[in-house]
């Protein structure tokens, strides 16, 4: 096997770990990687790499279960979910577990069950990881050819890709089945302020589903992030699941075409870079989804979006001043535009003031007050319901702003509470992690391409200053 990395040593490197960690075939001499390079030592040891991955899955699932139970233990049903620093329970509530009308949490037992199931699963994965890391065969090719592989084997690699795609498609269909048959999911748009319902009228029209992909990403359009009904979301998962499953079958049954064999780099590090690039894209999309979309991420659980909190403030003061006798249709603001409502350049009636930039917000508490041409002045005067006032006042004081020390909300707002929105956390974490994954993609892609081109030798050590120094010993 061609070693791609320089293994010359000019002076013996003595570390605490040198003697003890020279496990069979996993030391620096054999692999070109020191102990701290982690799984890089296992690139050609499929059995041990399996152990590392299964153990890692165990850690992930253990975190999910433990954090889930931690959130259940701290949960207070009387307070909104988004005021309690929760990031897992909102996802379970969105799936329709334990939720009643208006997003009220009526039963936390399903959340407890979820946590326990994840803990039990993590124990199984942890055992499997330790078994394969310490006891199982170093390589799988000889004993279990179905599970064995060589990174350069293009046909085997696309078969593995196909299996992964089928599993992803099955995951998409799990959401579809939950929404259609197993109790339904939470719909923030259900009449009267949100409820759990089964989705009966799926959107399967390719024109609608793929139309989202063709939309502009900018205001008023919003690409796929603009989806605002569960029918389209679940229909999209039917399409996505089907494409993944059929694509997976295709990749299992076929061999890569000549152009693909020539165009791609076929090595373990190249596959790592492709995966990191894909996950980075998913992270950036998830960031935009959780920040802007209040259908997939209902405001009842995640708190209002930024535009939603801003429009809620305009609405709250419109309600207050209208009660005090202001004529909200004609009152002028300091700029000469409408103080409470104004016309957009294209003629729709929108909220006035600073929130005009969020004119394209859609939210369940606001939509009933719209007419054919934006906000309806007569509805604003006669039809505002108490639940709309309550919800907008609540959202106004829970804007998704805040810092790490939890001094949340608008800094100058005297009614703000000490709070950081889960939207802030989830959007920021996915952006930051997406960025790190993107850097990892560039790093590993560069190394993989250099290795494939034959000039990856690590740092050139011929002229290192240390070579002219006296040996330490």
Swiss-Prot record:
Q: Which residues carry this modification: Phosphothreonine?
A: 15
Protein's gene: psbC
Q: Which residues form the propeptide?
A: 1-14
Q: How does it sit in the membrane?
A: Multi-pass membrane protein
Question: Organism source for this protein?
Answer: Marchantia polymorpha (Common liverwort)
Coiled-coil regions, chain positions: none
User: What does this protein's UniProt record list under function?
Assistant: One of the components of the core complex of photosystem II (PSII). It binds chlorophyll and helps catalyze the primary light-induced photochemical processes of PSII. PSII is a light-driven water:plastoquinone oxidoreductase, using light energy to abstract electrons from H(2)O, generating O(2) and a proton gradient subsequently used for ATP formation.
**Keyword Thylakoid tagged:** yes
Cofactor binding remark: Binds multiple chlorophylls and provides some of the ligands for the Ca-4Mn-5O cluster of the oxygen-evolving complex. It may also provide a ligand for a Cl- that is required for oxygen evolution. PSII binds additional chlorophylls, carotenoids and specific lipids.
- What is this protein's record name? Photosystem II CP43 reaction center protein
């Amino acid at each position: 096997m061609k070693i791609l990395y320089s293994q010359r040593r000019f002076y013996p490197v003595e570390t605490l770990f040198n003697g003890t960690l020279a496990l069979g075939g996993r030391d620096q001499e054999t692999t070109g990687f020191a102990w701290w390079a982690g799984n890089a030592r296992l690139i050609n040891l499929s059995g041990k790499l399996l152990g590392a991955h299964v153990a890692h899955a165990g850690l992930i699932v253990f975190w999910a279960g433990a954090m889930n139970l931690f959130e259940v233990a701290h949960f207070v049903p009387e307070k909104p979910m988004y005021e309690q620093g929760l990031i897992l329970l909102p996802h379970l509530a969105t799936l329709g577990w334990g939720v009643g009308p208006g997003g009220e949490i009526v039963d936390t037992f399903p959340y407890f069950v979820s946590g326990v199931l994840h803990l039990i699963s993590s124990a199984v994965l942890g055992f499997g990881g330790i078994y394969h890391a310490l006891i199982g065969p170093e390589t799988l090719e000889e004993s279990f050819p179905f599970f064995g592989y060589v990174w350069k084997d293009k046909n085997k690699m696309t078969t593995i890709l196909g299996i992964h795609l089928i599993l992803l498609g099955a995951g998409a269909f799990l959401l579809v089945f939950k929404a259609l048959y197993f109790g339904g999911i939470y719909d923030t748009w259900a009449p009267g302020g949100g409820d759990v319902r089964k989705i009966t009228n799926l959107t399967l029209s390719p024109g609608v589903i793929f139309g989202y992909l063709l939309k502009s990403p900018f205001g008023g359009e919003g690409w796929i992030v603009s989806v605002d009904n569960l029918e389209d979301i679940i229909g999209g998962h039917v399409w996505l699941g089907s494409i993944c499953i059929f694509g997976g079958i295709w990749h299992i049954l076929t061999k890569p075409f000549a152009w693909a064999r020539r165009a791609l780099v076929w090595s373990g590090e190249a596959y790592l870079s492709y995966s990191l690039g894909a996950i980075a894209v998913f992270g950036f999309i998830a960031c935009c989804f959780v920040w802007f979309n209040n259908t997939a991420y209902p405001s009842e659980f995640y708190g209002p979006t930024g535009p939603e909190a801003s429009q809620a403030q305009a609405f709250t003061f419109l309600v207050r001043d209208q009660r005090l006798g202001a004529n909200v249709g004609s009152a002028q603001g300091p700029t000469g535009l409408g103080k409470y409502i104004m016309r957009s350049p294209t003629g729709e009636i929108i909220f006035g003031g600073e929130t005009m930039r969020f004119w394209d917000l859609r939210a369940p508490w606001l939509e009933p007050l719209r007419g054919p041409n934006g906000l309806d002045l007569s509805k604003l005067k006669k039809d505002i319901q108490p639940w709309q006032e309550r919800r907008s006042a609540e959202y106004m004081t829970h804007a998704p702003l805040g810092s790490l020390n939890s001094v949340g909300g608008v800094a100058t707002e005297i009614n703000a509470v000490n709070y950081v929105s889960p939207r802030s956390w989830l959007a920021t974490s996915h952006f930051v992690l997406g960025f790190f994954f993107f850097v990892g993609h560039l790093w590993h892609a560069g190394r993989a391409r250099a290795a494939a081109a034959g000039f990856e030798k690590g740092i050139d050590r011929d002229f290192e200053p240390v070579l002219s120094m006296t040996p330490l010993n």
